[in-house]
Amino acid sequence: PGISNWVASSFTLSTASYTARWRGVNRPETGIVYIRGIYWLLMPEYKNRNALSANRPLPNYFWTANTEMRCLSRAIEQSLDHGYAHHIQRLMVIGNFALLTGLDVTEVCDWYLGVYVDAYEWVELPNTLGMALYADNAVIASKPYAASGKYIQKQGNHCQQCQYKPTKVTGPDACPFNSLYWRFIDQHLDRFGGNPRMGLVVANWRKRDPEERAVIVQWA
């Protein structure tokens, strides 16, 4: 009962935080209380969740940053060198890549916990497993934080110095995030088709020529 009340209070506080922001008051501590409440309510079972059946081994370059994808290389390199990275680097570059390629959930969570100096499991696990990897099936996030190369291009200048082009989907010089993104959508069409926040993306993919879709998925 105590834990249930804690989580219930967290939901109330989260709602209050949105109201406060509309009034010009920022209360980030309410989100922290919510995440901590989820952790204490759902652990230890939560740690084993893998809604998308992601099980590919963590690539070696997560420990060397030796990849030709510049945004990913720089994000990993900075993380290894400093034990820190910007939120966008953690979620929308490294986390996004792990999500799109179906990297093993436990291995990814352990990497985040071991690499970042500000990582405590009670806050790292829900953010990585739930938000970045969508492995908890919408407990934390109502949609997967999946994005193509065009989104990453808007977040920085790495694409200007990268051999891959964010405007291309297939081909040797195409940004891998693009084909991986559409393969991810194709792989989980049934799951995301009923999600209102994913409906437009799913509909656009289904409208594409079947041969074009097959080429993109194969390239990914």
Indicate residue ranges for each PLM-predicted region.
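C-terminal catalytic domain of photolyase/cryptochrome flavoproteins
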Residues: 12-220
